[in-house]
Amino acid sequence: MAHKKGTGSTRNGRDSNAKRLGVKCFGGELVHPGYILVRQRGTKFHPGVNVRRGGDDTLFAVATGIVTFERYGKWRKKVSVYPVEAAAQ
């Protein structure tokens, strides 16, 4: 039996940095090419019209227009950017 207490140890005490994921441009906003619309892991949102998906699944605009979030099938959602001229009509 030990007569000194000793220091003990733990394998906890770490935490990862927040990744700042989520929607960056909301529905109805005017965006330009290159604007980041959604930062995500996986495809919670799918790319729609004038939207492309980056290597880390980030969705970004490729045209100037208005952001819209739409249903895509029964369970999926997509993000589209419709040109301002088309949105005005």
Swiss-Prot record:
A biological-process GO annotation: translation
Coiled-coil stretches: none
One GO location term (cellular component): cytosolic large ribosomal subunit
Listed transmembrane segments: none
Superkingdom of this protein's organism: Bacteria
Pfam families, alphabetized: Ribosomal_L27 (PF01016)
Example GO molecular function: structural constituent of ribosome
Record carries keyword Cell cycle: no
PROSITE patterns linked to this entry: RIBOSOMAL_L27
Keywords: Ribonucleoprotein, Ribosomal protein
InterPro entries to which the protein is assigned, alphabetical: Ribosomal_bL27, Ribosomal_bL27_CS
Family (UniProt): Belongs to the bacterial ribosomal protein bL27 family.
The protein's name in its UniProt record: Large ribosomal subunit protein bL27
Species assigned in the record: Synechococcus sp. (strain JA-3-3Ab) (Cyanobacteria bacterium Yellowstone A-Prime)
